[in-house]
């Protein structure tokens, strides 16, 4: 498993210096995990603590001389599992642009920077959003109910609702577009979740009709 925690402050890596510190921390934060890892302290201190970062830069090219691709252009945190895919997509788009512009590097590289920058930002936004979801919401009853409603609506009206995860992972929809659509969906779902008796009526056609009316 991987531990994500701040470097400094309360309950941070800087406080985990001895076996006693580690045992105390894990018993407090992850009590059900401790019995499953008898060599917890040994594993903790034998694995390096490393940082995660998001890097945003522009432009991604220098005339017709060089371009940035993948992590060199849009390094991101790993919480959507899309870093390598985004890099491969850079390559696909670059290849398409080389064909489009008959290998005119200067024109191609300029357009590459313009069209890929929003999607580099998009995959970073998606990654940070998913971190918050995994950290705060996966055990939240209301959030889980929201996902049930979304799933039912997507099954009934697949042409009107594609879940954000599906847009990102199983289509060629640009990251920036998926992010924008996902945020519109989230805003719509907040209206649905604010219905006073949603816990009782979530599985009804009435709710499905209300969602249709919001699209």
Locate each region found by the language model.
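A short, flexible beta-alpha/helix-coil linker loop
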Residues: 6-10, 74-75, 130
